[in-house]
């Protein structure tokens, strides 16, 4: 790789980190519930993106955000499967959440706490749809599933959250 090409790759990665770094970090935190691990996962996400940038560039029309979220979710999944992760204290409080979420209203903090308590398959679509403003198509691509599966998981998660937040007294 010549110096010009390397510099172009570095510039592209710097732009991606500036543009999507916060979103990747939030996603990693919600998946891992640990600020330090989320930062490590974010770094690993961008390292994998750097290593595979050529493959991404061959995919015409692919979204950087969707590609990065797919990598981040896989990195988080690998972290959770590791033996070391099983020994991490998962009783973190919401005060550990980075990026100004602590300034949220008490109702918002309660909702976030309930979202964090959802099973992974339901938590991921909620996180990506409501907290990362991704479309159903982008979420489906990031999760490697169909749009209808994403839609169904969103509805199921919303139903569970509605029951949790209303104490089961919701008739919709």
Where are the model-predicted features located?
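Conserved RNAP core-binding helix
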Residues: 17, 25, 35-52
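Arg/Lys-rich amphipathic alpha helix in sigma70-family domain 2
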Residues: 55, 70-90
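Sigma70-family region 2
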Residues: 6, 46-61, 83-84
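N-terminal module of bacterial RNA polymerase sigma factors
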Residues: 1-23, 30, 54, 108-112, ...
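DNA-recognition helix of helix-turn-helix
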Residues: 73, 137, 143-168
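Structural recognition of an alpha-helix C-terminal capping motif at a helix-to-coil junction
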Residues: 40-47, 62-74
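A short pre-motif secondary-structure segment
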Residues: 125-129
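Internal acidic/polar
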Residues: 86-113
